[in-house]
Each structure stands twice: as structure tokens, then as C-alpha cells.
Amino acid sequence: MLTLSEIEVKVNELAQKIGAPQNILPTYGYSEQTARPHVEVDSWAYYYVVAQSGQEVSRYTTRDIDQLLYKIFADVTFGFSVRYAEENHIENEDIRRLAFQRQVELLTLLSPQWGVRGFHEHAQILKQAPFDDDGSLRAVYWKSLRDQGYSVARANQMAHEKYPYPKEPKG
């Protein structure tokens, strides 16, 4: 098992490759209790922990340093990617299209295997929640219907008739 100091060195080296600032990286051996992740290690495993206001929100456990590093950078690159997608959003396009693409690019810069893994994780998400490029159009139309006095139920029905949800995935 690597020590916390050795893990921190590896994380900082990887963070530098993608320009990730220190304040979005985990802490090591202690929690700020602000939902900023921290890393723990003992003789048995590595732990990636999120705690807030005295409550542990999540704990990921692994004995594999590569798995720990992937978990850290899946979170870091997700935040980067969402910010990138918001700044470069294409009108009437599901923002996840750009965010997912950017995250895979960043993960691939860190490790080609991580890029592949991220791509497959996105594919699983999209099986349950396909891209919805009409979401913003539907919302604007719904609001205009409500402003015209239509009930919530009727505005929903009309908005979904004009801009239907994507088809449910098969299987």
C-alpha cells in the first residue's frame, strides 16, 4: 500500500496534466467536512470518503491504487467537464453530450484505459436516461403555456406532445 504522501504526489502529478487546481482535489488523512472528498489508507485498503457536517456521505474502498486514482479523477474531470459544457453549450442540445465528450477526453489524457472506462460508464447512463436535445425547448414552451394560463397538467401534456421525451431504450 502506498502512503498518503505517496498518493498525494501521484494525484498532484496527474492533476497537473489537466490543470486541476488544488482546491478541487481531495485532502489526505482528514476531512474538511464540506463534502470535499478525502483519502484514507490503512494496511488493508485505500478509502475515498465524502463527509459533510459530521456525516459520512459515501465511502469507496479498494486495494488497487489505479482504481482509487480513477475514482478521484472521475470526480475531478466530471466537475471540469460540466463547467466546460456550460461555457460552450450548444443551443437545443443535451448538455451531457458535450460534458461526457469532454470528460472522456480528460480521462484519456490521464490514462487511455480510464477514457475507455468513462466512455462505458456514460453508455450505461444513457441506457437509462438517453440524451434529450428537446429538454430546453420543452421547458420554454411549457413556461409560455403556463404564462398563457394553461394548467400545469395541460401545459405538461401540450409541451410533451410538441417536444416528446426520447424513446425509452429497449432491453
Where are these regions (language model features)?
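A short, exposed loop/beta-hairpin motif centered on an aromatic-Gly-Thr core
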Residues: S53-R63
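Hydrophobic residues embedded in beta-strands of well-ordered beta-sheets
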Residues: W44-Y47, E56
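A short, charged, amphipathic alpha-helix used as a generic interaction element across diverse proteins
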Residues: R63-V76
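N-terminal "first-domain core" detector
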Residues: M1-S43
